[in-house]
């Protein structure tokens, strides 16, 4: 565990996130070299994708109940304006463009996924017109937050919905569900040939045409325009700053974009990119394409995956439209059809609007994060044996998804002792360490004749080592630990824009600060046990650091107890871990400390009193203390010395 750190020592948390993104891309498809190896992994990877999208398990499909709310037409096409249900009391809106006159028999169809133009389908009407004039049925639908649809794609982007992290809700998943339901609507049309349906779009629509094709194999061919990049360049080149929250899943399984979109294989996939697009990097998308194409080569179908590059900014060019048209003609229509370029908008907003500014009532689309999230439930036990079994299952579920990186982590803690001195009757040992190039710090203070118990106090972001020493220090042995992202390596939340995008970038590599802190605390505990013969180690933390201490104790049952100071009463308010609320909330996490000692300082009121009821049921109410810090720590040390 000893030894000096490498020459990256003192790197920032941002630098660590960037290197993590690069490593994810570098390790893409590791261990996969044959079609058998890919097929053996494919179902697992698709399930992981759906879980990262918040769609595992899938919501129940309700009846679409489509309602026609008007129509309009032009030369060679007619358009039906439709409202339909995404979920009960949650409405979507769409335009169905049909050729006029309609050809005989069933027709190929295009699901056009809109990007981020403010008035949704209105701004993309040229695409519906073009496809209808080329003999395709084309359905355009409004995204969440666009047109007349309520809801939010920018909750994290603007820093107003950090609770999405703990809910495990990403607008990428909300929009994917919206896309699946739009596909349901398209396939419900009797004139559509279900075996000849393609998906396309630009920007956010380019990303979601890919996401939809991964999730739903009813999509038979894809043409994505300016939709994505490698994880390495999306994060490392700060493209996250320019992207909506709907552009990536919460990447807890650490998959490069190429690994996600290779799940489309062997269906036809066209990737189109503008050379001068400010939101992406040519080296990133080219590498992504080459990695995806290797999977197509394993299927013996490299011609089904193609990259089309063209000059210009983040937009279509005439040659892009031609390439996409030829792609779908080949793979859906089965024949080459006359080329028709994109024209101008032909209809005013007052004509194209589906809801005329007011969706049907009731409409709960603004509640989609809550409606789509299945909250975990933990029953109160009737005995300690029952609770021990329940904790085993909770640990399994925690390590399966929200905290799975912690179990798989290959990151190492290196420590170097840089100070050993006496201050009165106390010995001070100072350690400078690093994990993946980011500095960590540990100061250990022991009496002249140390006891067998140690309190390990963990810094919260915004705290200093000296501040925590002054708050926690006492007659007992204690150590103060500065994990990554706290103390001197903490990002500055007063720089609100960059702080938000750092948080979002971390999510794109599957991390939150609380998750990193849990990982680092467990490493520090192992170091202290290896270097010294502490009979028992207790944990103390304030705020999110207190939450991290609770989870560290939940995962390491040799931890003697926890004092959690000023922690939130629910993960909706803080201590964010991706998707943690699908397993449990903070009162249940506190319960996982039982039957060990738990001290709660400045713990806000909450109505269920779940943790107190648990300790009462287990007959150990004396091991739960709610009150001041000094007494909470003193009781913990006292119980430790009695062997409780």
Report residues per predicted region.
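Alpha/beta-hydrolase-fold serine-hydrolase catalytic core, especially in secreted/extracellular enzymes
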Residues: 1-91, 102-105, 259, 265, ...
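Accessory cap/linker subdomain of secreted extracellular hydrolases
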Residues: 42, 145-149, 154-185, 202, ...
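Aromatic-residue-lined binding/catalytic grooves and analogous aromatic/hydrophobic interfacial grooves
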Residues: 99
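Cap/lid segment of the alpha/beta-hydrolase catalytic domain
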Residues: 103-188, 194, 228-240, 246, ...
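Alpha-helix capping and helix-loop boundary segments enriched in small/acidic/polar residues
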Residues: 118-126, 163-177, 199-210, 247-260, ...
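Primarily recognizes the serine-hydrolase "nucleophile elbow" in alpha/beta-hydrolase
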Residues: 134, 182-253, 524-592
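Alpha/beta-hydrolase-fold catalytic nucleophile elbow
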Residues: 142, 200, 225-226, 272, ...
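Structural beta-sheet core signal
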Residues: 199, 271, 457, 480, ...
